[in-house]
Amino acid sequence: MENDDIIAIVMAAGKGTRMKSKNSKLVQKIYGKEIVKRAVENAQKAGVKDIVAVVGYKKEEVMKVLGEDIKYAFQDEMLGTGHAVMQAKEYLKGKKGRVLVLNGDVPLIRPETLNKLIEKSIENKEYATLLTAIYDDPTGYGRIVRDEGGNIEGIVEEKDTNEEQKKITEINAGIYCFD
């Protein structure tokens, strides 16, 4: 599927403190290839040609891995996903079409899954579509809170969950499509 009218924003600024590494988590390798490189390549395999990486912590490492074929935006303060996306706003000016946002630490996401998310977003004429997953043990992930009709009411990060929300097994996969 060609996704010429889609721009991808890859969030690649995080510290990855839980990994306890002196290097960025994004340059750690899985089967010989850096995590962030796999995420970008999967977006490219999904037909997305216009990619912006939002870099911050150890940005030189991440930029060296990703090279010069993509654009960069800089996040000096780690203030969350929304703030990271806002750092790429100059690349969104005058753009028509969808914006695919994905975390740089999702190396195993399949291009087919990204295409299905984009297709559903277009088909349903949604302004915001997000990918979720069901985990037996959702510890550490943001929970998807839904209303009685099944509509998403919000995403509650692990540290902010109450006892009832801790039981929710549907998690935020960190991949979104916006119109």
What are these regions (language model features)?
Residues 1-21:
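N-terminal nucleotide-binding beta1-loop-alpha1 segment
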Residues 21-22, 47, 102, 167-171:
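Short glycine-enriched loop/turn motifs at secondary-structure junctions
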Residues 23-29:
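Short glycine-enriched, charge-decorated loop/helix-capping segments at active-site entrances
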Residues 109-178:
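Conserved core of the sugar-phosphate nucleotidyltransferase
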Residues 12, 55, 103, 132-133:
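Short beta-strand/turn micro-motifs composed of small residues
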Residues 1-5, 33-104, 108-119, 123:
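Conserved N-terminal catalytic core of the sugar/cofactor nucleotidyltransferase
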